[in-house]
Amino acid sequence: GLVMRAAHVGAGIAARRGGVSIARLRANMARLTGSEPAEELVVAAVRSHIRNYAEELMLGSRRGAPLAESITFEGFGELVAASVDGPVVLALGHSGSWDRAGAWVCANGRTIVTVAEKVEPRSLFQRFVALREGLGMEVIGVGKGESVFSTLVERVRGRSVIVPLLADRDISGSGIEVDLGTRRALVAAGSAALALK
C-alpha cells in the first residue's frame, strides 16, 4: 500500500543522506561482521527498520485473518506448553517486528508482558504503549538508568505469560559484558536473571 511504498522510498533517501543514526548503524554492522558494510546492506537495513515502524502504524487495522496470515510462528505450541507452568522468558535482539509478533501471540490466547524504553517525546512513548496495550500486551516502561526488575518479577510470578525482553542492549547501566560480533558489548541481564526466578 501507500504507507509501505512511502516508507520504502523515505528509508532509501534517509540511508543515502546519512547522519548520526546511519553512521551508528554502519559502525554496528561493521562490529558484527568485521568489515565495512556494502551500501546496499545499509539501505536494506534502514528500509527494514522503517518498515517495522510503518507496520506498527497499521497494526491496529490488522486483526484476525490479515494478522494471522502475516506471521509464521514455528514452535508456538511448545511455547504455550512451557508457559502453562509459569512465565516463559524470551531474550530477543533488536530485529524484526516485535509488536506484530506480540499481537499475534495475544490473538492466539497468550498474554505478553514486556518492558518498553521510555522514548522522547513522552507523547510518542504513550502512543506506543497504548497501541501495545490495545493489542493485548502488558507494558512496563523503563528509562535510562532505571530498574524495573522487581516490578517485572512481581507482575509475572505464577502467571502463564510470555515475557519477551530485548536483551542486546543495556540501558540500566547494570548489564553484563559479552562477546557480540567482533567486540565486547554491554547487554541487558534482565532476561537471564528473570528466567532464574
Short names for language-model regions:
Residues 60-197:
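Soluble catalytic domains of membrane acyltransferases
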Residues 1-92, 97, 125-129, 136:
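Membrane-anchoring hydrophobic helices of lipid-metabolizing enzymes
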